[in-house]
Amino acid sequence: DKQMIKEKDAFESEDFREMAARLEYLKEIRGIGVFTASPGMGKTFALRCFAKGLNPNLYQCAYLCLSTVSVQEFYRQLCEALGLESGFGKSQMFKSIQERLYYLYKEKKQPFICILDEAQYLNSNILRDLKMLMNQKYDSVNCFSLILCGEPYLNHILEKQVNEALRQRIVVHYNFHGLTDQEVSD
């Protein structure tokens, strides 16, 4: 059962190491990272290992995998992850989320890391709003890290013209290649 695999028992394939290194880099610089692979290749496990290794005194992390939701529901999930009230309209939740993200970054010195798994199912309105959430202080600072993880189809979604502004903000992008011949023989 893959759920029972402990982080300490991880087989560190080339893909695992590449993703781990890129996640560490993204953690430091903040911004958007995209990770794609076919099902069962270890993306979610690598995310779990990364999240488990975060110092909770230095980072606040949320893992969201219910990606087939409306924009309103997405905002509710994000509010809940940030410890905010979610009973308001979209514009109030958006404002509250941006204020909390800035507070965590600037005042608390505990930047937020948002992991969105199964991101290939996010609708285009959520993708557009993610770009707007990244706008802080007239784009002069990235207050948080956004990790979009999904199947290879996510790359095609991000290549669409409508997602150009979001795509331009991606600072880390990695596509899993699968086990090497050497890794298979080991």
What spans do the regions from the language model cover?
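A short, basic N-terminal segment
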Residues: 1-30
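Conserved AAA+ ATPase "SRH/arginine-finger" region at the nucleotide-binding site
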Residues: 64-67, 158, 171-183
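Conserved NTP-binding/hydrolysis module of P-loop NTPases
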Residues: 59, 69-88
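Walker A/P-loop nucleotide-binding motif
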Residues: 29-49
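Conserved catalytic segments around the Walker B and adjacent sensor/switch elements
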Residues: 56-66
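Conserved Walker B catalytic segment
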Residues: 32, 102, 109-148, 161
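Conserved alpha-helical scaffold flanking the Walker A/P-loop in AAA+ ATPase domains
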Residues: 22-25, 91-107
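Short regulatory helix/loop adjacent to the ATP-binding pocket of P-loop NTPases
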Residues: 51-54, 154-169
